[in-house]
Amino acid sequence: MNREGTFIIIIFFTMHLKFNLSKKIISWYDNNKRALPWRVPFHSPKKLYYRLLSEFMLQQTQVKTVIPYFLRFTNKISTLKKLSKTNEKQILKYWEGLGYYRRARHLLATSKIIIKEKNSILPKTLSEIKKLPGIGDYTGNALLGLVYNQPRIALDGNVKRIFSRLINKRENKINFEKFVTKNRNKLFNSKRNSDFVEAIMEFGSLVCKPKDPHCNICIFKKFCKFKKSNTKNKLTSPINFSKKSYSIFCYINNNKQIGLTNKNDLGFLKNCNLPIIKEKINKQKIKNWNFLCNYRNSISNKTLNIDLYYKFSRKIPKDLSWYSLYDKKEFIPTFTKKIFRRLENLY
């Protein structure tokens, strides 16, 4: 670690001892926490399932977006054991609209391992829990803290923002992982480690917000160097939005059907039902296809520029299967449904 990194850690370490971060933030949490459907009592039999499901759903998705999907999912599948016995097609249907469907597949695979190989018990170490599909450092630490009350911090954007503002240093100048690892016992001064995991994330979401933080009601305002700073420096690293351009080719027929395939490698929609998608092709080079429209589709931090083409055909390539534009029983990602709505205008 460089000298600057060491200096930052010393500053924060001194500050932590000065006002006991964990107890102070848990006290705030007790009075201000949101009533979220996955927040069940610590000894509830639903705890493992609800925490596992919510952590997967919350990956790259905001709380307010997740809530209705979580309620719908748990209404259909009430236990982890039932989840492990549900087929992938049905899981994807219940997940439909939430996006990033790889999460749903990982959740299903993880549930099978926990039920069949782990005797319905979640692994208790980070190294073991990370062997489960779809679980990395962040989700692993969150689950160990939430399920087992272990002294853990899930280092999401909310938590990093709080720490960086307390010392008024840019996030990329702080080695958060090393700091938490080396000073874990001093960071956690409460027996309520599970609540601390949620409290610090909740505080970052409701008070120490990315834009327009509520500094005047902040419980740390007496100690926060960001609050005392006249410059109010921008401490977080900007999100890099990637831009991609695609040409999408849709086989359709007179029965209001479209040819789709799940044999694709489109990252965020890998193995989902989609038309033929290719890296953008110059319009002048495309023959025997009708151009329908150009549009943009934003997914998380991606902006997709899409040229949409179609042709009426009785036959389709072997990799494709016919799907009705109006069938609501099949799992169809929102990305594809937006294509459906544009094609409906042709009938």
Locate predicted features.
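Generic detector of intrinsically disordered, low-complexity, polar/charged segments
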Residues: 1-2, 94-96, 131-133, 154, ...
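Intrinsically disordered, low-complexity, charged terminal extensions of DNA damage-control enzymes
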Residues: 3-40, 44, 205-347
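Catalytic cores of DNA base-excision repair glycosylases
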Residues: 13-22, 28, 32-214, 220-223, ...
